[in-house]
Structure formats: structure tokens, C-alpha cells
Curated annotation (Swiss-Prot):
It is found in: Host nucleus; Host cytoplasm. One of its GO terms (cellular component) is host cell nucleus. It comes from Chloris striate mosaic virus. Residues 35-138 form the CRESS-DNA virus Rep endonuclease domain. This is Replication-associated protein A. The lineage of its organism: Viruses, Monodnaviria, Shotokuvirae, Cressdnaviricota, Repensiviricetes. PROSITE patterns: CRESS_DNA_REP (PS52020). Implicated in enhancement of V-sense gene expression. Acts a an inhibitor of C-sense gene transcription. GO terms for biological process: DNA replication; symbiont-mediated perturbation of host cell cycle G1/S transition checkpoint. Residues 1-31 are annotated as: Disordered. A motif (RCR-2) lies at residues 84-86.
Length: 295
């Protein structure tokens, strides 16, 4: 099988794989065009009876002009007995293809991914092989980050955390030592500042002085009108008068307290119970009814 055209790009770079178009490789509305650019390729051929050796030789032949460093092919079996192949390919330089059929083996099409963690991907391919095939030597990719530089940055950050005494000082020190990170990750640094220097717990202070809420503008009015209201039944039990007389006396008290009738010189009720309650309006009446005492 002749190889399909590919283009090669030099230099380091992370690979990118996207959705493979359906319908014979034609891009349909809503789908993205296939593109692969990487040094490390991870392939999975589901339900593929081809042997690892045959598959490996075909892939190696297809990549013979691409400076291929290493190929590893393993075969595993599903629980239903169907075989599938895993293939890991390492190239010397980045290569790019826009053909979703580039790694097809006869009629078997693989799932194609750029292996962003080459060593872990190779280890995954080697986990439970029934058989395998190998070509070349795997070269562990170089880590771009300098260990010395990373250790120095960690040391600087530890010093900032140890020496800062407030949120503002912490953020100021971070901004001075790591200006770029401060600009693009300010929200994360603010979060860590809040964690390092939390607000002191606030002591609860009741908004109203009285424990019974009688000084509350709404609850206090409700207490006076509802909770401290004496029923005719309660008054008749205490004063030894009929319930009807108690109702008359309570109505008189209501008129007295709500309209200021006493100041206008209206004649008072002669009921003994009424005369007592006249001096016990509000919370005192509730205490009187509860304790049964007029003293």
C-alpha cells in the first residue's frame, strides 16, 4: 500500500489530534478537519486480527522516510475474545498529516491520538500483551523545565509565605517576585492570600437589646397586640366574673388604651376585676394570668 502525503515540521511541540471525519473521510457540517502534528503517536485498532509483527512492519514501511526512532505493537483480547492492537510510535521530529486514513491497515482504521505523555503511553501498551513486536529504541523525551530553576522558584515562594504578615504584603511580594504569574493568575493568588490570612471570626452581637424582642419595631408591636392580650375566658377565671362581663371589661380596656378615653373624662367601669386590670395593662397582665397573683 502506498503511503499518503504528509508534511513534516521541525522543533518541539505538543501534538494535536481532532475528530476524524466520517463518511469516507469527507468533512461534514459540524465536524472539524482531521489534523495530527506530533512526535509520539498512540494508535488503537479495535477488532483487528492482524498480528503485531505484520502491523508493525506495515507501519514501519509507511514511516521509512520519517526518521522513526521506535515502534511498539501489542495485541490484547477483549472479554468476548475479540483481538485489538495498541501501537506506540516515536519519531525523531514532528510530523504532520491531515489524512485520517494515514495509519489504516488494510480495511482496519485506528483511533489516532497524540501521546502527550510518551513514557506513560508506552507503559499502557505493555500492560497485558498477548503478543508484541518492537522496533528501534525508545528515547525518553527531554524535560524542558530546568530542575534548578523550578527549585529556585519554589524556594522563593516558600520565603514569601513564611515572611508575609498580611494579605496585602503577600500579594505585593508575589507581584515583585513573579510579575507574569501575578498578572495572569491574580485570582488564584488572592485565593491563597485569603487562605493564609483569613478574617478573624466575628463575635455575634444581637441587633436588639431585649431578650423578648419587645423593642423590635415589628415583633414588639405584635407582642403588645397579640401575645399580651387577655382573653375573656382567662379574665373570667381570674376575676371571678362571668365571661360576658369579662368581654365587656376587655372591650372597655381596649377603648381606653387605644383611644385615650380616660383622658377625656369617660366614666370608668365599676367591675372589681376591671379596676384591677386597669392598672395591669401589657406584660403585667400576662404575668398575672400565669401566676394567679395580683400582688
Amino acid at each position: 500500500m502506498s503511503s499518503l502525503p504528509v508534511s513534516e515540521s521541525e522543533g518541539e511541540g505538543s501534538g494535536t489530534s481532532v475528530q476524524v471525519p466520517s463518511r469516507g473521510g469527507q468533512v461534514t457540517p459540524g465536524e472539524k478537519a482531521f489534523s495530527l502534528r506530533t512526535k509520539h503517536v498512540f494508535l488503537t485498532y479495535p477488532r483487528c486480527p492482524i498480528s503485531p509483527e505484520e502491523a508493525g512492519q506495515k507501519i514501519a514501511d509507511r514511516l521509512k522516510n520519517k526518521k522513526c526512532n521506535y515502534i511498539y505493537i501489542s495485541r490484547e483480547f477483549h472479554a468476548d475474545g475479540e483481538p485489538h492492537l495498541h501501537a506506540f510510535v516515536q519519531l525523531e521530529a514532528n510530523f504532520r498529516t491531515t489524512s485520517p486514513k494515514y495509519f489504516d491497515l488494510d480495511e482496519f482504521h485506528p483511533n489516532i491520538q497524540a501521546a502527550r505523555q510518551p513514557a506513560s503511553t508506552l507503559k499502557y501498551c505493555m500492560k497485558h500483551p498477548e503478543s508484541s513486536w518492537e522496533f528501534g529504541k525508545f528515547l525518553k523525551p527531554k524535560v524542558n523545565r530546568s530542575p534548578t530553576q523550578s527549585a529556585s522558584r519554589d524556594k522563593t515562594m516558600k520565603q514569601i509565605m513564611a515572611n508575609a504578615t498580611s494579605r496585602d504584603e503577600y500579594l505585593s511580594m508575589v507581584r515583585k517576585s513573579f510579575p507574569f504569574e501575578w498578572a495572569v493568575r491574580l485570582q488564584q493568588f488572592q485565593y491563597s492570600a485569603n487562605a493564609l490570612f483569613p478574617d478573624p471570626p466575628q463575635t455575634y452581637s444581637a441587633p436588639y437589646a431585649s431578650r423578648d424582642m419587645s423593642d423590635h419595631p415589628v415583633i414588639g408591636e405584635w407582642l403588645q397586640q397579640e401575645l399580651y392580650t387577655v382573653s375573656p375566658q382567662a379574665l373570667s377565671l381570674h376575676a371571678g366574673i362571668s365571661e360576658e362581663q369579662a368581654r365587656i371589661d376587655l372591650q372597655w380596656m381596649s377603648d381606653l388604651t387605644r383611644s385615650g378615653a380616660l383622658e377625656s373624662g369617660d366614666e370608668a367601669c365599676t367591675s372589681v376585676g376591671q379596676q384591677e386590670l386597669e392598672r395591669l395593662l401589657g406584660p403585667e397582665v400576662l404575668e398575672l394570668i400565669t401566676t394567679g397573683s395580683t400582688q
